[in-house]
């Protein structure tokens, strides 16, 4: 059995709240139970988790964001990959499927709808951040 946290690059996810909703994307190819998730992708050599979150958001959704703060890191319970989560603020653009090879949908999700998109729950620091930023 291989240790995926060292064999594969870390993944950085962007947590973007706008107008009381959080941006989620649906992967064209599911990763186990993982279908809807935050914009995310591999951290490239020489890149910080925050820089990767900003880059991946632009590549996947066409939305320009700025990193606000790193919320935390963990080994994802469903994928075994090392994940970093960065809170980001939108700067310009409109979220859309910009990379049709990777995504097939984007959605701005209200606080109460999150369990419908992520039924297995969120990483606690991400949930806490969303609880503070979004009306229940």
What are these regions (language model features)?
Residues 2-23, 42, 73:
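Conserved N-terminal beta-strand and adjoining loop/helix that marks the start
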Residues 10, 34, 82-86:
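Short beta-strand micro-motifs in enzyme catalytic cores
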């Amino acid at each position: 059995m291989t240790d995926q946290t060292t064999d594969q690059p870390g993944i950085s996810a962007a947590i973007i709240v706008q107008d009381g909703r959080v941006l989620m994307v649906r992967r064209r190819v599911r990763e186990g139970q993982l279908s809807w998730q935050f914009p995310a992708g591999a951290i490239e050599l020489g890149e910080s988790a925050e820089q990767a979150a900003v880059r991946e958001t632009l590549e996947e959704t066409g939305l320009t964001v700025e990193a606000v703060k790193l919320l935390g890191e963990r080994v994802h319970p469903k994928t075994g990959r090392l994940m970093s989560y960065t809170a980001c603020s939108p700067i310009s653009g409109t979220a859309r499927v910009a990379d049709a090879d990777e995504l097939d949908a984007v959605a701005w999700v209200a606080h109460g709808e999150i369990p419908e998109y992520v039924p297995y729950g969120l990483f606690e620091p991400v949930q806490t951040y969303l609880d503070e930023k979004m009306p229940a």
